[in-house]
């Protein structure tokens, strides 16, 4: 079955160093480094106490780098008023919730036919199932015996799926009860877009918000990737580079508003891009998260181009995963080379935020 084209008609972002696509582009063009040290008091412990100089750490409570991509100044931009939830309630929620609220609202307001479509609007959220800062804080309060009446909002316990439902309800979306979140690791945002497109193509919705957020407990992330020996000890993101030594965690959120292309054209929407095909794959019983299967990537890319009615030679720009881990990058180079063959295409990394995102093959 041919993929019915879907238009991206609005977008919104809250990213390290940028709160819009234009700001991010300008930062990239300027070669700005959007990575930096962990914000003060973010970890609730002196980061210097946790830093291990060597990668081969012998305990699980150390980190090999204190750098990451952090959204700074968000509280000055986020307005908790105007939602169907009281501002006081929103104030007590973890920043992860607020990032989703903010980007979903901005994307919805960017749709020209938004108000008329509200009753037929849904939301899908890509959100990794890691503990948030709020969940960690709540757990600390429980363990330390803080009375229930004095604890932070208990909804912070549910930082994986609840943000999608609360955001949809806060925006009074007609399909709010169908809003959901998903975790497909690094492919989560692509799955969110695919499932949002499915809802449009099946006639279940007329407008879909496909959102993604990364705002887990940053100490948990740094320790976890250190234990996996996947965290860059130099704190530098260097995808497809011979000196790449791991990934650098970053936080942020984004949301795109999607409509069927024919409807978007009819209603005079501003069309930012058109999705003509999507390919998905799963490694199944593979080697693990840090050792993706080459064959699975080849099948996913081939399926995407087939559903779009395109050939690899038709592609002018390729955005790669390219985390900066040597095994993962090597697999991606091989799979992409198999799909594109002799066709040379400019390539960049969608996760590279230190100001040098374009790598040409």
Please provide the spans of the model-predicted regions.
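Condensing-enzyme catalytic core of the thiolase-fold
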Residues: 2-361
């Amino acid at each position: 079955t041919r993929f019915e084209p879907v238009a991206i008609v609005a977008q919104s972002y809250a990213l390290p160093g940028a709160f819009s696509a234009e700001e991010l582009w300008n930062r990239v063009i300027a070669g700005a480094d959007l990575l930096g040290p962990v914000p003060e008091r973010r970890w609730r412990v002196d980061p210097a106490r946790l830093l291990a100089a060597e990668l081969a750490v012998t305990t699980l409570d150390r980190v090999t780098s204190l750098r990451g991509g952090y959204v700074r100044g968000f509280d000055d931009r986020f307005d908790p008023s105007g939602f169907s939830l009281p501002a006081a309630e929103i104030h007590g929620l973890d920043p992860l919730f607020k990032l989703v609220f903010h980007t979903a609202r901005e994307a919805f307001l960017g749709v020209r036919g938004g108000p008329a479509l509200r009753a037929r609007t849904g939301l899908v959220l890509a959100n990794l199932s890691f503990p948030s800062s709020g969940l960690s804080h709540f757990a600390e309060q429980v363990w330390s015996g803080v009375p229930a009446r004095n604890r932070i909002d208990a909804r912070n316990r549910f930082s994986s799926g609840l943000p999608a439902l609360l955001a949809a309800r806060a925006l009074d979306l007609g399909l709010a009860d169908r809003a959901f979140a998903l975790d497909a690791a690094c492919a989560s945002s692509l799955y969110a877009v695919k499932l949002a497109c499915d809802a449009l193509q099946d006639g279940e919705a007329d407008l879909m918000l496909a959102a993604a957020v990364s705002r887990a407990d940053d100490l948990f992330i740094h320790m976890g990737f250190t234990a996996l020996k996947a965290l860059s000890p130099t704190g530098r993101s260097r995808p497809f580079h011979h000196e790449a030594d791991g990934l650098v965690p970053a936080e942020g959120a984004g949301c795109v508003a999607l409509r069927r292309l024919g409807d978007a054209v009819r209603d005079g929407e501003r069309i930012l891009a058109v999705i003509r095909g999507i390919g998905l794959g799963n490694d199944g019983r593979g080697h693990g998260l840090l050792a993706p299967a080459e064959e699975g990537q080849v099948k996913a890319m081939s399926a995407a181009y087939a559903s779009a009615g395109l050939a690899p030679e038709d592609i002018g720009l390729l955005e790669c995963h390219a985390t900066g881990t040597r095994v993962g990058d090597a697999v991606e180079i091989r799979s992409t080379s198999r799909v594109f063959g002799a066709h040379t295409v400019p390539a960049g990394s969608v996760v590279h935020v230190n100001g040098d995102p374009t790598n040409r093959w």
